[in-house]
Amino acid sequence: MRIGAYQFAVSNSINHNYEVIKKAIIRASADGIKLLVFPECALTGYPPRDIESSSVVDFQKLDKVYDQLQDLINENEIHVIIGTIFRKDNEYYNSAIILKPNQDKQFYHKKALWGWDRDNFCVGSESGIFEIDGCKVGVRICFEVRFPEFFRELYMDRTNINIILFYDVADIDDEERYDLIKAHIRTRAVENITHTLTVDTISPYQTAPTALYDKSGYPLIELKRNEEGLLVYDLDDFELDFGEKGRVEVSDWVTEKVV
């Protein structure tokens, strides 16, 4: 399956973000991409960096944008995962919307909340596991990368690839944080023996990679930091090598003992 990730400077304008996402979808479809992912809160902006709070989002406009995106996805026969904000009654969630050709939209709501997230959002409860073009895909959002437990849930369900949407930036060029987040991602890939695709916004300074790591945590492709761009990769290596088989066997043994 050809997969893609698009990094860009997320803004406070739903219309602007939609136009960037629309162009990226059309470009990705022309490149034969079947699954395209975008950063955390890519449609709405992230509170309070881009918008004052989750409650100021124009949800009527957002619903119209979802409909426009669904038409675009039907036309281009592509699966898309986009960061957004979800409202249910008076509760708001930091969410990923999963859009598939000619199917109902699905959501994953972020569980690990702290700081600005806790100020603006409620804790989600969904598994974050979706079937996309014959693959079992796990979805997690930003801060969750720091907790192996959230990824062990995905391992237990034998996901083929895990996706992490980030809005992780700094006001200074913090390469140390970038490397730290990258280390977390590589560890999650290794310990769960699962390809891991990540995507981040780019402004002011990007502090998480837009990249793909293999089942042993090795980087397969990584975009240049702080520049808008499209990552493209043909992912077809789901067979386990000798070391990966060992990690699966021991992981399953340890999990049985814990459970």
Language-model features: locations:
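Cys-nucleophile CN-hydrolase/nitrilase-fold catalytic domain and related Cys-dependent amidase chemistry
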Residues: 14, 23-101, 170-190
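Short polar catalytic/cofactor-binding loops
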Residues: 7-13
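Structural motif
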Residues: 34-35, 137, 161
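CN hydrolase (nitrilase-like) catalytic-core segments centered on the catalytic cysteine
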Residues: 65-79, 146-228
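Extreme N-terminal starter segment of soluble prokaryotic enzymes
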Residues: 1-4
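Residue-level detector of high-confidence beta-strand sites
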Residues: 95, 105-110, 164, 222-223, ...
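Active-site catalytic loop in hydrolytic enzyme cores
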Residues: 87-157, 174-183, 239-257
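C-terminal beta-strand edge segments of enzyme domains
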Residues: 129, 201-259
